[in-house]
């Protein structure tokens, strides 16, 4: 599928669905206190199928949804926006230069993207309890890693195997 309004609508619907699932289930699912960040996972995986501009928009949109759901007043709203936008932009830059779309690539992209986004967030909005924060970030990265493959296959089925700007067909 080429870059079209339908592609943008599909990506927006995927982010909206991820936001609904994040709001409904993320707080009730826990692994040693760590919780998944489905919006970040979805935006990172969708960025694998997008160029730089679309990936940055995906990161910003996912961060805006996430911050609207989870950020209390005066608690890093802007830092969430900036950190997610930068990381998704970086993944979008890699799309053309470094890899072909693959579920084997999605796992490290999501894990390292989660770590990068959370470290940037921490740099912009430092918090007390560094060890507790680091533990939660690592657990979130593990959760997001578990969600990477299903998210990848779902987005790939929705968008097709091709990347942004390429016609349908083989890569």
Model-found features: residue ranges?
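Terminal, non-globular segments
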Residues: 1-171
């Amino acid at each position: 599928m080429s870059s079209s309004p339908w592609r943008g609508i599909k990506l927006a619907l995927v982010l909206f669905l991820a936001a609904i699932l994040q709001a409904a289930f993320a707080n009730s699912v826990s692994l040693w206190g760590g919780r998944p960040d489905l919006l970040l996972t979805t935006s990172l995986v969708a960025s694998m199928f997008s160029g730089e501009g679309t990936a940055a928009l995906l990161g910003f949109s996912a961060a805006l949804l996430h911050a609207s759901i989870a950020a209390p007043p005066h608690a890093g709203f802007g830092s969430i926006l900036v950190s997610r936008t930068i990381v998704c932009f970086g993944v979008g830059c890699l799309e053309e230069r470094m890899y072909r779309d693959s579920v084997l690539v999605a796992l490290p992209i999501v894990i390292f993207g989660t770590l990068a986004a959370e470290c940037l967030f921490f740099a912009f909005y430092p918090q007390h309890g560094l060890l507790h924060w680091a533990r939660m970030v690592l657990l979130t990265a593990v959760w997001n890693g578990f969600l990477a493959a299903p998210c990848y296959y779902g987005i790939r089925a929705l968008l097709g195997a091709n990347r942004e700007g390429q016609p349908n067909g083989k890569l």
